[in-house]
Each structure stands twice: as C-alpha cells, then as structure tokens.
Amino acid sequence: MSSTHPKVAWVGLGIMGSPMSENLIKAGYDVTGFTLEQDKLDRLTAAGGTTAGSIAEAVRDADVVITMVPASPQVEAIAYGPDGILENARSGALLIDMSSITPQTSVDLAKAAKDKGIRVLDAPVSGGEAGAVEAVLSIMVGGEQADFDQAEPIFEALGKTIVLCGPHGSGQTVKAANQLIVAVNIQACAEAVVFLEKSGVDLKAALDVLNGGLAGSTVLTRKKDNFLNRDFKPGFRIDLHHKDMGIVTDAARNVGAALPVGAVVAQLVASLRTQGDGGLDHSALLRAVERLSGAQV
C-alpha cells in the first residue's frame, strides 16, 4: 500500500458512507465505490469517484477496502462468500470496517481475513452525519499498530480524534460504550425538556443556560434544535441505536458489567420502535418521555 495515495474501495454509501467517501476524494484518494442504491453511486460519480457493479469488481485492485454498513449481518454478507471481500481482495490489502457491529464479529472477521493474507482494522466512528460531512469524526480503532500507522492518513481525512484502542474488537467495544453514553445523555436531556415544558419555562432560554454550565454536552448542543423544533428527521435512527444498545447490553453481560440505567434506556428505545418511531432520529426519545408524561407526542 502506498503511503500517500493508496487505491481505495468503499462498500456502503449510506448516510455516513457517502460523505466520508467524498472526503477521501477531496483529500486526493482514488475511490471506487459499491452500494445497492443507484442514486448513491451517481452521487459518488459526481464527487469524482468511480463506481463498480459488484463488490468483487470494487475491491479487486484496491490497496485499502473500507466498509460502512448498518450491522453485523451486513458486514458478514459483504465479507464472506464467493462474491465477498475476502475472496476477491488481493493478498496484502487492508480492510477497514467502519461499521458499528459486535466486537466478536470484528474478531472473527480479522481471523478469517488473516487466512487470506488480508489485514483488518475495526474502526467505528462517532459524530453522526454532521461529523461525517465536516470530517471531524471520532474514530476508535482496534487492530495492529503497524496497520493503524498505515491507515492513519486515511483516518485523518475523515476525522479529528483518532485513537488505537487495542487489539481487534477494541474499537467496537469502545463504540458500544459511546452509544451507551449517548443514549443515556439523550434520555436525560429528553426528561429535562418535558419537565421544563410542563413547568411552563421558556424552553429555549432554559436549554441555552443549561448548555453553558456543567449540564452542557455535545449531545445537548447537537440535539437542542431537534427538541425545540420537534425535528426528528434522521440523523441517527432509533432503529440503529436499538441495535447498538443490544450490542452493549450483550457485551456487558459477557464481561459481568452491570448497566442498570442503560438497560432502562434500551427498553425505552425498544418501545419507540414498537410504536412506529424506529425511522426517526434518536432525539425522538423525547416522544417516549412525553408518552409516559401524558404530554405532546
């Protein structure tokens, strides 16, 4: 892999993958993309990238393969099998999976890839669509130091805070903790919003002053307008946060860590899905609190 301009294949051009791949193109990388939606392929072409008709075609000549898909089943579907990445990427290629999946899936993928001579990093991100567009994502990485060092210039084109967290699966473990913190924080903000509204306080003024003190957070900064305007257009969908809460709950159980507050929030996220809100932004946790409080939904 060239240290300056490796040839990149990108699989998965969704809400996160599209702007991230475009930022690589802006940084001077040759990017060939594959996804199932033609409009996303057209967008990549318009940004200066190349598109492929299959995973095999996309990865065959790539130095680096980057994947960004919704969950573990999708990672397994694109990685394994005769048409998958492992059977078609060249020996010596570096596979960087930036999806948010279970730590064990990442560990298993790294083991399978090693048998094919393919190196792997798990590198999930935090920062949402805005962070992807602005190239200021936090990137938490699991894998070997040498592979991280080679991938770091790519990460620097995508994010701002980039950390090697440990061996394979460590990036996913840290991402699971991130999703726990974010969900609990959004839930706390949502409860505060309902409390303030039912108390007759000027909500905008209250959130402004709260965000200037110890209660302030990146979550409140990013989601304040969602609460004020009741704008729940995703963003990061409840469906995906439900998946992530399942990951952190299972992982915590496996290591014997108690997550009492996280477990309650996970159930509230699940309740939103059953009431048809799974496609909304995760700031729609406000709707769960409102239902419990007999307030506006």
List each language-model region with its residue ranges:
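Interdomain hinge/lid region at the active-site interface
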Residues: 168, 216-282
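Rossmann-fold dinucleotide-binding core
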Residues: 100-180
